[in-house]
A protein has these predicted regions:
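Short glycine/proline- and aromatic-enriched beta-strand/turn motifs that initiate or cap beta-hairpins
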Residues: 24-70, 447, 454
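Outer-membrane beta-barrel translocator/channel fold
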Residues: 48, 84-137, 188-247, 252-258, ...
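Residues on the lipid-exposed face of transmembrane beta-strands in outer-membrane beta-barrel proteins
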Residues: 67-71, 139-143, 176-180, 236-240, ...
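Outer-membrane beta-barrel "beta-signal"
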Residues: 449-463
Length: 463
């Protein structure tokens, strides 16, 4: 059973090892090699059983192992490797439906109990036996240019290539970026581009599963014909040092995805009928800005970030993030004991509480079908008897909760302990979302809105 690639992509990026991002901002190659490891757990809250019409109310549990290696070739270049091994288990949603016949808006009342007579929204789920594995592998190189007598500009540029593989999915990608510093390193300009080719081969194909597995693995119409997607992205940014304690930055990006029907979720089928159809392309624009403010007297740094997102599916979102980084350095005059040991070996601790708010509007084709409409759709599928046709949804339509209007809040805490050339890092995050936290359509039904807990722990070692 296919999992939510977009969600996992989003989850993986949030957990990414920090080495590459940090080095990309430097103008001289690091002098030491670095190896890092992260173990992460991601656990979604179950859906209220009263809202589940068919299938399991369990959601995804994801375990992620990440590896990072950086090695200097000389004073001006490094090579890198990043690898990920991920396992997933749980149940996947097919669609959301109204239980009334005409699909009208549900009655807004105070009860949380599912009752068909109140037109509450229900969710059709798969069984809870989904088991998936994913492997990512990327290699890269980065080159550094220092300031010289002939040129005041300094910077770096790099590229990486790799793949992401699952039993039914393969993505090949390349990316490159560069940055240059000017005005005595007060101004930094950056730009980059990436390209990915994804191939989907949904399994099992229609008619190849036995009765025991059928509820967990519905048939896969159209997948053998339309299984390619490309993704092209460009970005540009500028960073400015305002004074010794304040840095601001701004970035913009544009991404275009094309996929005939790959952008459609082939795994959203119910009783043999497709219940998901999306446009053949998706254009996405982002603008982000951030501030880093140091307070030297407190050994503190404040991070504030804002991100605007728009796409031609009708989704518009805003994200605001705030974080406080507090550093504690052990400085002791003791001649012996644990405090003396930590002081002599440069032991330091960093804690970083953070909060984030997010809201988005719904895609123009987001809708919740009525049970009657789904039944009619299934009947049309069976009557047509053509597994290679894609005409049962005559217009774009999806009940994917990621395309609904909602808002989200998350809070987390990071921790870092440094000892000589070793650093232990950990963080956790609690996330909740609902239409009531959003700005538009706050009274809509979204019983499958995402809630999750995530933690990460790992080590970095320089040698």
């Amino acid at each position: 059973m296919k999992k939510n690639h977009k969600l996992l992509a989003l989850t993986a990026s949030a957990m990414t090892l920090p080495g590459i991002a940090i080095q990309a901002q430097a103008t001289s190659a690091p002098a030491e090699s670095e190896v890092g490891y992260r173990f992460s757990g991601y656990f979604e809250s179950d859906i209220d059983e009263a809202r589940v019409i068919t299938g399991s109310n369990e959601r995804y549990d994801i375990l992620v192992n990440q590896f990072h290696l950086l090695h200097p070739i000389n004073d001006h270049a490094v090579v890198t490797y990043e690898g990920t091994f991920e396992t997933l288990s749980g149940a996947s949603q097919y669609l959301s439906t109204y239980r009334n016949a005409d699909g009208s808006e549900p009655v807004n009342d105070s009860t949380d109990v599912f009752d068909p007579l109140t037109d509450k929204v229900g969710v059709h789920m798969s069984g809870a036996s989904i088991q998936e594995k994913r492997i990512d592998s990327f290699v890269g190189a980065r080159f550094y240019k220092s300031k010289t007598e002939e040129s005041d500009a300094a910077g770096n540029y790099g590229a990486k290539a790799g793949f992401s593989s699952e039993n039914d999915y393969l993505s090949l990608s390349i990316a490159g970026d560069g940055s240059m510093e000017f005005d005595d390193a007060h101004t930094t300009l950056s730009a980059g581009a990436s390209f990915a080719l994804d191939t989907l081969d949904p399994t099992p194909a229609s008619g190849t599963v036995d009765a025991e597995d059928d509820s967990n693995s519905p048939g896969r119409q159209w997948s053998s014909i339309y299984n390619k997607r490309t993704s092209s992205s460009v970005f540009a940014g500028v960073g400015q040092i305002i004074n010794p304690t304040l840095v601001v930055q701004a970035n913009a990006s544009f991404t275009l995805k094309n996929g005939t029907t790959f952008l459609t979720d082939h795994y959203r089928e119910f009783n043999g009928a497709s219940v998901d159809r999306r446009p053949k392309s998706r254009a996405m624009v982002t603008f982000s800005t951030g501030m880093r403010k140091a307070i030297p007297d407190l050994d503190t740094a404040i991070h504030a970030d804002y991100r605007f997102y728009w796409d031609d599916w009708g989704v518009l979102s805003n994200t605001l993030s705030l974080a406080w980084y507090q550093r504690f350095v052990i400085d002791s005059d003791d001649e012996s004991g644990i405090m003396s040991f930590m002081s002599d070996n440069d032991v330091a601790f960093v804690i970083s509480p953070n909060v984030r708010y997010y809201h988005q509007t719904a895609a123009s084709f987001y809708e919740i079908l009525s049970e009657t409409a789904v039944a009619n759709l299934s009947e049309e599928q069976q009557t047509a008897g053509d597994s290679n046709s894609y005409n049962f949804l005559t217009s774009d339509s999806s009940s994917d909760p990621r395309l609904a209007a909602y808002g989200a809040l998350s809070a987390g805490m990071g921790f870092r302990a440094e000892f000589l050339d070793i650093a232990f890092v950990s963080n956790f995050e609690l996330y909740t979302s609902s239409p009531g936290l959003g700005i538009s359509n706050r009274n809509q039904e979204l019983p499958n809105a995402m809630k999750y807990f995530r933690f990460t722990a790992g080590l970095d070692y320089k040698f």
